[in-house]
Amino acid sequence: MTDNVNHPRHYTQAAAQLEPIDVLRYAPFCIGNCLKYVIRAGYKGDALEDWRKAQLYYAWATENLIQTEEFLLNYATLLVKFDRLSLLRTAPSQFLEDLKTMIGGNIRALEIVCKQN
């Protein structure tokens, strides 16, 4: 009997014997969906439709790449700033200004990405 929840047939029959979740759980949404449709093309429903969906998600991922990179850079910078909590003790006003700037940048980048998806 096929386990349609944990191992759906349209994924386990694919030539690569690779279930999308093995890769997708680590991928950004649009890239993950692109890969999902490529892996299952021809095994569930209309193959051409899956390829078109993959192409569409690839285009969206490409459009969002710059915003995503900026978001990740800002997020990484924010984490570094949090790691330097000693600045909070020595220069609290500067720390708070930096924090406001970084959080504001992340919120703007996230809003842009969400609006495009």
How should each PLM-predicted stretch be described?
Residues 1-117:
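Intrinsically disordered, low-complexity regulatory regions
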